[in-house]
Amino acid sequence: MNWAAAVCWALLLAATFLCDGSAAKGGRGGARGSARGGRGAARVRVRPAPRYAGSSMRVAAGAAAGAAAGAAAGLAAGSSWRRAAGPAELGPEDAEDGAPGSNGTGRGVYSYWAWTSGTGPTGHRHLCPLLGGALGALRLLRP
């Protein structure tokens, strides 16, 4: 996993931690059973502990831990793993077009980018700063 993905997961974990309300109610909402207003009952509101308190936090923490483990594994492996070829790069399978018995179509004929736009693929490296800036502008990253 590359660093951009690890940073995105860390941002997701931070946003979940800061936006997860401690008063968030889990389970079924509303009054249940005799708490709806039985006869002679005192009107005292007792709030039990939420059923699923912090479940989103546990999921986000697990996702961030997985992202960190993936980034660490990627660093440990280093150059021993073969990196997948991107849309603008040639891989070992791309030499099949010139092989005898092939239909001779070029690489760009069946490409998604060739059919949808006249430009090449663009990098999405600005997604994490954009996400952080948007969350900051919406004031969602405050405690």
Swiss-Prot record:
Location(s), subcellular = Cell membrane
> What GO terms fall under cellular component here?
nucleus; plasma membrane; side of membrane
Q: What PTM annotation applies here?
A: N-glycosylated.
The molecular function terms in GO held by this entry are:
nucleic acid binding
Lipid-bearing positions (GPI-anchor amidated serine): S117
Predominant location of this chain?
membrane
Propeptide position ranges: 118-143
Superkingdom to which the source organism belongs: Eukaryota
Glycosylated residues, per the record, are N103
Membrane topology reported for the UniProt record? Lipid-anchor; GPI-anchor
Quote the tissue specificity entry.
Answer: Mainly expressed in brain.
GO term, biological process aspect, one: protein import into nucleus
Q: Which Pfam families match?
A: Shadoo
InterPro entries named in the record: Shadoo
- Keyword check for Nuclease: no
Signal sequence, start to end: 1-24
Write out the entry's keywords from A to Z: Amyloid, Cell membrane, Glycoprotein, GPI-anchor, Lipoprotein, Membrane, Prion, Signal
Q: Describe the task this protein carries out.
A: Prion-like protein that has PrP(C)-like neuroprotective activity. May act as a modulator for the biological actions of normal and abnormal PrP.
What protein family does this chain belong to?
Answer: Belongs to the SPRN family.
Record's protein name:
Shadow of prion protein
User: To which species is this protein native?
Assistant: Bos taurus (Bovine)
Ranked from the top, the taxonomy reads: Eukaryota, Metazoa, Chordata, Craniata, Vertebrata
